[in-house]
């Protein structure tokens, strides 16, 4: 197989987005458009991927990291000029180069693979990805000869009345023989109304050289959607959401209301898991089998076990074990590890805490910067007092400890194995194992106090 290369065009500012955020960084289902494109391209067994950056170059590089190499297009002088920036990386390479726009987040690796196969089978020097549009207004038209061969691409504004009736459009994705691409690109002129160097002009150059130019027509126009404004962004979001949700349902996940369920493209969900409406799953999330999520739950960059239930709650950058019950209205904050068979109940906040197997915090508690052992019970209103205004301190609650209601554990402090803390205590010193800590004022009852008040 020939070596494969990819050039992703991501230099445009995207003025029609009317945004401070550069166009290709606008998210679709939680992931920037350009990252969707790059991630799909990387499935093609590439030898090298080059992203052409311009506006927002540093932000794009930061987002993509080492997934790509980069070339800067300092002035946006057209698509051919953009591809030419990759010349130092690719001009001396033998193989095929696929050129993709960074604002086409719905394009799949499967479609690009089919285009590459068509390119190879036809022994073409250039292959165009085309699609049939119900309304082709604004798109370049694919003009074919009587025998079906591609003759040229005509931009909408330059098309004749007859040519505008053509519904097969240029999607802006191409495959080239690498040597032919960089030989022809040096011949592209900017003699046009915009004064720019257009990549479609390479077709006529190659045809004039007697080279084969092919086209692969995808049956899915949605895939080729280019995002240039917020309307198209909304359409891409909807199409991507439908694709992601359909994949999970086909893999055995139940979505009670797919239209109101938002799942990251990077989420992995086990079979027989049920997701209720209003659930938002962001980033790299793993969810086991037979789990119930939602309604109205947000999970971000976390791992959730099997047979776990999370209702009306937030889990962020944390790990939750098997057979856990969370919520309603619980908040698992970053760097928390929740063990197996745990209960985290109403209005409980957990932050940066190891929470052991079979332990419980059922109501109205804050547990931060803590190590909670196994079989621990935190009564209603238990608080780890972890912050002195400057530093955070560790609270350790060892296996089998029982913390009574409305207790404050002032860190740094340790409650030993099997120890009890009496309700209403403020604990400032370590509690030995098996001991009972009582840290509250002794109750005093004053007889007839209220009666005497009312006499005054």
From Swiss-Prot:
Which GO terms fall under biological process for this protein?
A: cell morphogenesis; cell wall organization; lipid A biosynthetic process; peptidoglycan biosynthetic process; regulation of cell shape; UDP-N-acetylglucosamine biosynthetic process
Q: Where is this region: Pyrophosphorylase?
A: 1-230
Any binding details for the cofactor? Binds 1 Mg(2+) ion per subunit.
Q: What Gene Ontology cellular component terms go with this record?
A: cytoplasm; membrane
Reactions catalysed according to its record: alpha-D-glucosamine 1-phosphate + acetyl-CoA = N-acetyl-alpha-D-glucosamine 1-phosphate + CoA + H(+); N-acetyl-alpha-D-glucosamine 1-phosphate + UTP + H(+) = UDP-N-acetyl-alpha-D-glucosamine + diphosphate
Residues the record lists as binding Mg(2+): 103, 228
To which pathway does this protein belong? Nucleotide-sugar biosynthesis; UDP-N-acetyl-alpha-D-glucosamine biosynthesis; N-acetyl-alpha-D-glucosamine 1-phosphate from alpha-D-glucosamine 6-phosphate (route II): step 2/2; Nucleotide-sugar biosynthesis; UDP-N-acetyl-alpha-D-glucosamine biosynthesis; UDP-N-acetyl-alpha-D-glucosamine from N-acetyl-alpha-D-glucosamine 1-phosphate: step 1/1; Bacterial outer membrane biogenesis; LPS lipid A biosynthesis
Return the similarity comment: In the N-terminal section; belongs to the N-acetylglucosamine-1-phosphate uridyltransferase family. In the C-terminal section; belongs to the transferase hexapeptide repeat family.
The protein's name in its UniProt record? Bifunctional protein GlmU
Task: Give the species.
Answer: Bacillus subtilis (strain 168)
């Amino acid at each position: 197989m020939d070596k494969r290369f990819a050039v992703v065009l991501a230099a445009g500012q995207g003025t029609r987005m009317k945004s401070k955020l550069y166009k290709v960084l606008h998210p679709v289902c939680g992931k920037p458009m350009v990252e969707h494109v790059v991630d799909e391209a990387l499935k093609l067994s590439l030898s090298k991927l080059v992203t052409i950056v311009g506006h927002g170059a540093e932000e794009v590089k930061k987002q993509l990291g080492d997934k790509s190499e980069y070339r800067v297009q300092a002035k946006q002088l057209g698509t051919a000029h953009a591809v030419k920036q990759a010349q130092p990386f690719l001009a001396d390479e033998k193989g095929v180069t696929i050129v993709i726009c960074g604002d086409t987040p719905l394009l799949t690796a499967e479609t690009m693979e089919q285009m590459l196969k068509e390119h190879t089978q036809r022994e073409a020097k250039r292959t165009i990805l085309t699609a049939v549009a119900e309304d082709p207004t604004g798109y370049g038209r694919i003009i074919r000869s009587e025998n079906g061969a591609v003759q040229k691409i005509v931009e909408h504004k330059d098309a004749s009345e007859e040519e505008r009736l053509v519904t097969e459009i240029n999607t802006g994705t191409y495959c080239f023989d690498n040597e032919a691409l960089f030989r022809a690109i040096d011949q592209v002129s900017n003699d046009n109304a915009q004064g720019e160097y257009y990549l479609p002009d390479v077709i006529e150059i190659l045809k004039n050289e007697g080279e084969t130019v092919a086209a692969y027509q995808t049956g899915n126009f949605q895939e080729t959607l280019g995002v240039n404004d917020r309307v198209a962004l909304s359409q891409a979001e909807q199409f991507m959401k439908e694709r992601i949700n359909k994949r999970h349902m086909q893999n055995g996940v139940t979505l009670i209301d797919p239209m109101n369920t938002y799942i990251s493209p990077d989420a992995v969900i086990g079979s027989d898991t049920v997701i209720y409406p209003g659930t938002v799953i962001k980033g790299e999330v793993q969810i086991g089998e037979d789990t119930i999520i939602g309604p109205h739950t947000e999970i971000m960059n976390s791992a959730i076990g099997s047979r776990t239930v999370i209702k009306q709650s937030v889990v962020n950058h944390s790990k939750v074990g098997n057979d856990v019950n969370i919520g309603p209205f619980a908040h698992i904050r970053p760097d928390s590890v929740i063990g197996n068979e745990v209960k985290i109940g109403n209005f409980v906040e957990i932050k940066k805490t190891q929470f052991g197997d079979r332990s419980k915090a059922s109501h109205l508690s804050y547990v931060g910067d803590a190590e909670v052992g196994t079989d621990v019970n935190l009564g209603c209103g238990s608080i780890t007092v972890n912050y002195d205004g400057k530093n955070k301190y560790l609270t350790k609650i060892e296996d089998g400890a029982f913390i009574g209601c409305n207790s404050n554990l002032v860190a740094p402090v340790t409650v030993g194995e099997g120890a009890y803390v009496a309700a209403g205590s403020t604990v400032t010193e370590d509690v030995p194992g098996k001991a009972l800590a009582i840290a509250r004022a002794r109750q005093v009852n004053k007889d007839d106090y209220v009666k005497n008040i009312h006499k005054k």
